[in-house]
Amino acid sequence: CSISYENYETVRAVPYDMMISGADCKAVSVLRLWKAVDTTNFNMNLFSQGQYVKAIQETSNAEVISKVLYPSDDHDEGKLLRLTQQYFLVSASLQSIIADHLAAYGTLGNLAEKVAIHINDTHPALCIPELMRILMDVYNYSWEAAWSVVTRVVSYTNHTVLPEALETWNVYLFKLRLPRIYMIIEEINRRLCADLWNMYPGDWDRISRMAVIGYSQVRMANLSVAASHTVNGV
């Protein structure tokens, strides 16, 4: 089935590359940073009418995304901005990776052999559903084909075993900001729970602990474990 997007906000991601050299090394690593830029032109009509704040606000909403990384999240506005930032950085990086890969090889058929994405803690865990989205919605992969690629590309490092320290997102806020990504996570969770039921029939406590979605929360660590070919802890 085809997916159409409605009532979305378009943001341009502008890359800034920092070259990092090592001691006695002939190679240079690249650290790519991203800036969010609004795609709409400055509204001169509003400005000419004296609506200065509104004219500026229309172009500054997108730029807030990369203005201050990870603001306070003790209120819903902060949580939504933090979620937006995580998605922005993940999506921009993945689109850059795929564009570079296609430029080099002309096909995504060997993506899993040429690309490795490591989730170091859960902040970039949205790369899992976002890569699924790109493969399915943009390149017409089936679910099974896209999942096969994702689970061969992604690995994960977990940094804590304390349940209260593991990153989770409220389902309501998640659906509000990233509806398509939530749809994909829902399907990941459904398939995971079905597999867990086959392995542990009747053990609802175990399955509920391992599920990606539970108690109105999206559990990013569980998502990372479910989609990674390798997991380690530090």
Where are these regions (language model features)?
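A conserved ligand/cofactor-binding region detector
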Residues: 1-234
